[in-house]
Amino acid sequence: MTSVLDVTNRDRLIESESLAARTLQERLRLVEEVLVDVLAAESGQELVDLLRRLGALSSPEGHVLHAPEGELLKVIESLELNEAIRAARAFNLYFQIINIVEQHYEQQYNRERAAQEGLRRRSVMSEPISGVSGEGFPLPHTAANATDVRSGPSERLEHSLYEAIPATQQYGSFAWLFPRLQMLNVPPRHIQKLLDQLDIKLVFTAHPTEIVRQTIRDKQRRVARLLEQLDVLEGASPHLTDWNAQTLRAQLMEEIRLWWRTDELHQFKPEVLDEVEYTLHYFKEVIFAVIPKLYRRLEQSLHETFPALQPPRHRFCRFGSWVGGDRDGNPYVKPEVTWQTACYQRNLVLEEYIKSVERLINLLSLSLHWCDVLPDLLDSLEQDQRQLPSIYEQYAVRYRQEPYRLKLAYVLKRLQNTRDRNRALQTYCIRRNEAEELNNGQFYRHGEEFLAELLLIQRNLKETGLACRELDDLICQVEVFGFNLAALDIRQESTCHAEALNEITAYLGILPCPYTELSEAERTRWLLSELSTRRPLIPGELPFSDRTNEIIETFRMVRQLQQEFGTDLCNTYIISMSHEVSDLLEVLLFAKEAGLFDPATGASTLQAIPLFETVEDLKHAPAVLTQLFSLPFCRSYLGSNSTPFLQEVMLGYSDSNKDSGFLSSNWEIYKAQQQLQKIAESFGFQLRIFHGRGGSVGRGGGPAYAAILAQPAQTIKGRIKITEQGEVLASKYSLPELALFNLETVATAVIQASLLRSSIDEIEPWHEIMEELATRSRQCYRHLIYEQPEFIEFFNEVTPIQEISQLQISSRPTRRGGKKTLESLRAIPWVFSWTQTRFLLPAWYGVGTALKEFLEEKPAEHLSLLRYFYYKWPFFRMVISKVEMTLAKVDLEIARYYVQELSQPQNREAFCRLYDQIAQEYRLTTELVLTITGHERLLDGDPALQRSVQLRNRTIVPLGFLQVSLLKRLRQHNSQTTSGAILRSRYGRGELLRGALLTINGIAAGMRNTG
């Protein structure tokens, strides 16, 4: 095993001698040694020896050492199924443990960084690379027109920017940001204005669902806690450390042995409410406690540099969720499921508040003998006595000299009553008026009532010269989470609404032809007419199909949610695959029928949010927004929002990438943001872009800091909304320090991108060049994916897409509508499949051809220009950096093995030609990325990431060969079963499928993403 893991090679991940680096090295050594001991004890030394032999397939750099032929491949092919499964499980377990150690290291590193920020502040660049938005100091450029642009910059400027930009990307903290703003002479009034409107919303989704079982997640958390305890021991007295360390090592070994004996695969397909509980875990265990720390860190950093400025409101960072509300392609998200989700969320947050108030009762033991209270607190106690006499009888004597404890006893009882009432509402069939009602004052109808009581206590403490951090933290949490924890977005695909209206209008006989046959202009006219009348269109009793009835009932359920939980819980309806303005008007018509849209005024408590996903829809998005803003009721409609005159627009990274490739997708999204912002400003409206980013690069994933800074100037303005995919929640929010770091990084990037900008965004000729590159890249990508008749068969045979669809990891089907076409396949399994085979094709294919064709026009000048882009333009640098990172994870040798071994004999020649085409594009892309970046090897600019990728690649190589072997056996078994041939395998299909799925789990853990 040690030859696979190479535990003696201590410089593989990081060369720094920091405490965090030493901790990483020590922890890697420890867990690898423990894992070897566990495997030997549980499965014998033979398994350890087998893993060492398999490790010889990969080089130290993490790629296949040589063509996979000869004795080693014979070993894999000759493995008994049980041996192959044990090997796959061992690699899977190794990756998951390494992930824990890396997260632990990241947390340790973040602590070190926070402690050293005072030194780091003096390390900021002396030369600014960007300026104040709209006011001053944009980075000067030498290009004034297209001719100048193509002439290229000087080598000196290239070098200086190459040195400077990585320094800026190293940081992402408040303590670094505010001194930098001061150094750049950003006017404090601009900073204050931005802080006043700072609005960051992170939306958790269930898809792609985390591939790891919740049971395994629990074990991972226990391992992480043991590593934390080891850290504490290292700071203890030496005579205590050895004995305790041995005890912890024994506990670690015991935990991993239990883990080894636990099934890794999901035993059943999760239901939607299972996904809800999984997501809520991160709020309960981490996020709830981290939010006050985030606010305190911002406030402290701000006041150290700008003591006169006021920090933003507590609600500057909020959360949303699609889990339980996203219906797009998921038939299991019913109205009652969404209702139960809202109750689950409220129950969680109320339980946390109850715990906090109980702690405050113990803490605030102030006596009237030693402190004064204000009359308003005494008045409130008299009112409490009338409303909750039982509490007065119980505590009046005990707390007669302790007014804060008495007040909090009343608060606690109201919270408990509110929680009990919420539990009674959890069954959807029980409406609010049917639930047990309490008298006013005995429970809280909304979070603002609870907050008012906390503020009363805080004000009394401050007036008497006291403060209570735990109370301040609770107030912060209430302002951020309220009683609903996170806002619930509803999402549905656009054709569902059109088909429902088609059935409704046909039943009523009010249109001359089916609704779906109307032109866009005819649809718009009819929808506007219906929106202007109070006459209901839909009868109270629903005589329609189940699908249409469910659409109608969803809107009625939203109305009930708003009545019970408040409009803040659920006020956005996202329309996926939006094409025209009629897609939005259809949703507003259903909202009107449910009482959410007022036809007399145009006011609405539900906003229709278009989601533009394909390249064609992104190009058409400005026209759709123009039509929406031109509607006669639009000003009243937007003016009724919680943020007046703000329209939200969602841009999809996944389907646009699947549709046109990585470069074209990113450029179309970039352009769409610029155009939509200009349109909103021309109508006098505000715009919030909702970024539908996935976890993988092929779906818009990657470092959030660089991605936010790469957005066009003037499109953020302190306001952003981003999805946090189910698969990345563990890597970002499983540990408090990681969660705090992630939230601080996002907030820092939003402030920085709003106040500082690169003037390159305004150079039109540079956009023309990007348009050329995007067009060429798209043509190359689509030629392979959509214009090669054998490609869909190639994809189905050489990737594990068939087997991925059988993983029990998601409540949602892998395809829209169940059709087996490339267009119906969701972007998540599309990316997942290419990741498993090490092609990672969606994140880079077509980029090399686009760069090559551009460089061929004027080689020297255009190369200089592309390097200039890379050094100066955050957008272009982000694109190239993501491509570089993805290329480093590609392994064409293992990919070739998938093609050779999994292709049907009649397809092998054609599929090998496709492989050669992909391999040629890979080599071309790698060569040109290295030329532009100036690196000798991929990721030379980030040695720590380079070593991490190499470490993972090395162990993924043998796991990939195991996967191919198991897939081949499984498919041969399926083929023999289908043809009626005599089965030659000694194993059943279930055992073979289990082995294949275990390798999928392992590679996903190694690559750290599914889709």
From Swiss-Prot:
Domain of life: Bacteria
Keywords: Carbon dioxide fixation, Lyase, Magnesium
Record carries keyword Hydrolase: no
Residues annotated as catalytic: H207, K658
UniProt-listed InterPro entries: PEP_COase (IPR021135), PEP_COase_bac/pln-type (IPR022805), PEP_COase_Lys_AS (IPR018129), PEPCASE_His_AS (IPR033129), Pyrv/PenolPyrv_kinase-like_dom (IPR015813)
Name of the coding gene: ppc
Cofactor(s) needed for function: Mg(2+)
Molecular function terms from GO: magnesium ion binding; phosphoenolpyruvate carboxylase activity
A cellular component annotation (GO) from this entry: cytosol
UniProt-listed GO biological process terms: carbon fixation; oxaloacetate metabolic process; tricarboxylic acid cycle
Highest classification ranks of the organism: Bacteria, Bacillati, Cyanobacteriota, Cyanophyceae, Acaryochloridales
PROSITE patterns documented for this protein: PEPCASE_1, PEPCASE_2
Record's protein name: Phosphoenolpyruvate carboxylase
